[in-house]
């Protein structure tokens, strides 16, 4: 249309809907894909990750957020641990999100701010600021950027440590450091 495809220094740069969606999807946060956009239904792909991670991976994809909310309204999805995202504000159908959150038995919000989703929380956990985190983010150009913390988390735990504590309390054996 504008002649900006196929030439050096130009191209398509689709913007994603939320911060670091690119990086989290690259790492396998989609319910139907493992890291590197490898589909969970492919036996050979699952085997690679099962061997690497030492766990069995279900070949059925998990639910996406809208499907989780549908299932909550229907009564089959009972709880949500929402970390670092205000789904009530980021989803285009706020009434759908509110109905789903209200129908759940347990909503845990782990965030830096008491956001709109936190209004539905049974438990709110304080999150860490960017100053308290080590990690990476991927920008819209797919450049990976390193982040280094400048201070320890004031709440005592890094966000990933809270996730690990929850997982271990539910029977996992996560020993990340």
Model-derived features with residue positions:
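Non-catalytic alpha/beta scaffold blocks inside enzyme catalytic domains
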Residues: 1-7, 15-177
